[in-house]
Amino acid sequence: MPRVKRGVTARARHKKVIDAAKGYRGRRNNVYRIAKQAVMRAGQYAYRDRRNKKRVFRALWIARINAATREHGMTYSVFMNGLKKASIELDRKVLSDMAIHDKPAFAAIVNQVKATVA
């Protein structure tokens, strides 16, 4: 059986992991064994949190809309129900942005919803 020399491929594989671990603290950024584990764990966190990010942002938008609607004497749940009844098809992301950056337009929507609900 012929001898296999892996100097180039092994170095390339190690370099890829060490480069991915750049900026990590302690031995995690320069010891291959430890860096490999750290990079794997970082990938797991990244995978998990790409899914969690969607939940977190939705919760943030709901909290912002709730705060803005309460300024106009209405709760979030009543407001969202009124939006559906008034057939206003704006998603939570847009409503949240309007509540912060375009208060008059948001107030107009709230008044329109109040008229529909009442």
From Swiss-Prot:
PANTHER family: 39S RIBOSOMAL PROTEIN L20
Coiled-coil residues: none
Any one Gene Ontology cellular component term annotated for this protein: ribonucleoprotein complex
Function: Binds directly to 23S ribosomal RNA and is necessary for the in vitro assembly process of the 50S ribosomal subunit. It is not involved in the protein synthesizing functions of that subunit.
An example Gene Ontology biological process: ribosomal large subunit assembly
Swiss-Prot/TrEMBL keywords: Ribonucleoprotein, Ribosomal protein, RNA-binding, rRNA-binding
Pfam family, one: Ribosomal_L20
InterPro entries to which the protein is assigned, alphabetical: Ribosomal_bL20, RIBOSOMAL_L20_CS, Ribosomal_protein_bL20_C
GO molecular function, one term: rRNA binding
Domain of life: Bacteria
Claim: Ribonucleoprotein is one of the keywords in the record: yes
UniProt similarity note: Belongs to the bacterial ribosomal protein bL20 family.
Taxonomic source organism: Cupriavidus necator (strain ATCC 17699 / DSM 428 / KCTC 22496 / NCIMB 10442 / H16 / Stanier 337)
Name the record gives this protein: Large ribosomal subunit protein bL20
